[in-house]
Amino acid sequence: MSDIKTKFINDPENITAELLEGYALAYPNQVKLAAENIVVRANPKGNDKVAIVTLGGSGHEPALSGFVGEGMLDCSVVGDVFAAPGAQRLFQALQLMDREAGILLVVLNHSGDVMSANMACQLAARKGIKVKKLLTHDDISAGIGANVDDRRGLAGCVPLYKILGAAAEEGKSLDELIEIGERYNKNVATLAVAMRSCTHPQNGGTIT
């Protein structure tokens, strides 16, 4: 069995921070690090337009931070490898994105992401931050027919980011964006296929 290295990693314990720092350095005209594990647009749009925010674990780069930019996401909140970011970090991002037009939080249907999003939105509501959630559940391999709630949010989020981001740039309201997103969710399905299991860069364990 080959022992050829397939990853360039300085320190497995610091991999997420280095991934995001490297990405921000590589594309300074597109993104910047606003805080630890929070990636935002280098040139933000006005507060009169809805901010599009998402969250998820690292380890899938350039997703999800690679979709931050004009006409797409305004902010990506990143967790550890294959793990959701904590509610406090997401709440910090919502505070940074707070604006009159409101925030649309796009949440991929994974238990950790959903839990963090629910808690962060509760904290935001107490602070008077205008935010609404949109849950994506496109992966039909995890839930067939009526079991929509069992479906994971996967690659179907990418066109959604573009559609919502472009609509937000045009000045669509938060309610209009929710309507667009819900219509999209009803008409998209993806199927996850993998050639082999992946390995965790920090502990080397196999993930199936």
Can you describe what each PLM-predicted range is?
Residues M1-I52, T206-T208:
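N-terminal amphipathic/basic leader segments beginning at the initiator methionine
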Residues S2-I4, N47-L55, L64-V77, S141-I144:
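Gly-rich Lys/Arg/Thr-decorated short loops/hinges at beta-loop-alpha junctions or inter-strand turns
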Residues G57-P62, L108-A117, R152-C157:
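Gly/Ser/Thr-rich loops at beta-strand to alpha-helix junctions
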Residues H60, F67-E100:
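Glycine-rich oxoanion-binding loops at beta->alpha junctions
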Residues S76-V81, A125-D150:
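Short, acidic/small-residue loops that bind anionic groups at enzyme active sites
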Residues V114-G128:
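Short Gly/Thr/Asp-enriched flexible loops that form oxyanion-binding sites at enzyme active sites
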Residues A142-R151, Y161-T208:
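Internal, active-site/partner-interface "lid" segment
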